[in-house]
A protein has these predicted regions:
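Compact, glycine/acidic-enriched structural inserts
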Residues: 1-24
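C-terminal, well-structured catalytic/ligand-binding subdomain of enzymes
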Residues: 1-7, 29-32, 37-160
Length: 160
């Protein structure tokens, strides 16, 4: 689903319609959970075999290492319920001028050490930029400007 978005074979809206009419299941030996967002700030959360949730322009959306449909009923060492709760508390207390730096502060405060966080990403919709850091190297933030390309089908975005 998200690969089709990245390769511009499907738009966010097309993905949303697909999830609404088709039960999404993991393939044998592979499991995934997706949280997709469009430039307008809408969020589509997909947990194969369990369901999906569409959030229209939420103030924030936190992705988890556990099923949002099971919550704390299922325990495993990497689930990170404490990190999820810390991130939610920081985001609940966020101020109006919350920016990319503040986002990385939340990601840093909730990064995982048991199974170390490999990539942390922030998308700034106003600047149309993606920021990321790898391996919790918070001092090395990468940045990529996205450009609109209306001549291409799909999401209409490409890396420059």
């Amino acid at each position: 689903l998200d690969m089709d978005l990245l390769t511009q074979k499907r738009t966010f809206e097309q993905t949303k319609k697909l999830v609404e009419r088709t039960q999404i299941c993991s393939v044998p030996g592979l499991t995934f959970q997706a949280q997709l967002s469009d430039r307008a700030g809408n969020v589509l959360r997909i947990t194969p075999g369990q369901g999906h949730t569409y959030l229209e322009r939420p103030g924030y959306a936190v992705m988890t290492n556990f099923s949002p449909y099971k919550g704390d009923r299922e325990k495993h060492p990497w689930m990170g319920l404490d990190r999820y709760q810390a991130a939610r508390e920081l985001l609940e207390a966020a101020h109006e001028t919350f920016d990319v730096g503040d986002c990385f502060a939340v990601l840093k405060a909730s990064s995982q050490t048991v199974c170390p966080t490999v990539v942390s990403m922030v998308y700034d919709a106003q600047q149309n930029k993606v920021f990321w850091c790898e391996n919790r190297e918070w001092q090395n933030i990468g940045c990529r400007q996205l450009e609109n390309d209306e001549s291409r089908q799909g999401a209409g975005l490409q890396l420059s």
